[in-house]
Amino acid sequence: MTSEGYPFVSYVISGRSAGSQKRRFKLYFDLNTGEDRVNVGSLGEPTEDQKKRADLIFYNCMRTRNGTIFVTNGAQTDVNVFENRPARNFYSGFGAATAEEILGDWGYEPDAPLFTPRIALVKGEGRDALFAIAARQSDDDDRTYTGQITVPVNGSEATGIATYKGLHESEAQPWRGVDLEHLNLCLVRFPIRGVDPEEIRDSTYKAIDPRYVVAAAAAVYDGRKWVFAEPKNKWDSLEEFEAGEAKKWPV
């Protein structure tokens, strides 16, 4: 909750490789639905490496529908085909299907050797938030573990769900189903504070290691609709990104 008592959601991405770093968030207004969405896209023309992983690293991460907001880390937000077969998604399928059922259609990400979990947040007009995850059972067991948990929303702290055992990308230890005796284990408490979506966005961005943070987005529910801030990106242009990369590897 914001300091004024309004629900908020935020989403942040990080990355270690140049391909993961060379991304940006963009806010779009959907003329067909009359609602906003946040897209994760390439900063400039996608590289060959990015093209190979496009379905994993480029996606709509935040969408709203009839007062409910869906936040996920992949195509499970609103895509209805996975590996050439039908798959349910949160934007059009949640309600008719549970979060676990939707993530079960997708499983964890096929990005060996990490096999990053797929995660999701669903927040409606009530005081509860739903978190869900699909993770590889273990390094030696390729079955998919799915779980979901409902968490009361309060004004004392922000709760989030992480794909990694630690908050920061540098630790690179994705959750495995065998680790999750209770789904609370992959929930994290964030020191996020603010009144408006811009303050929430900035607070979320600052919560991540500055070496790895890529972009952050946030929205606040004002009692009628979800109000989005323009996303905060580490790089505002391809030229800035390339200059930053050059500083890492001086000639």
Language-model-detected regions and their locations in the chain:
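Conserved short alpha-helical segments that host acidic/polar catalytic motifs at enzyme active sites
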Residues: 1-251
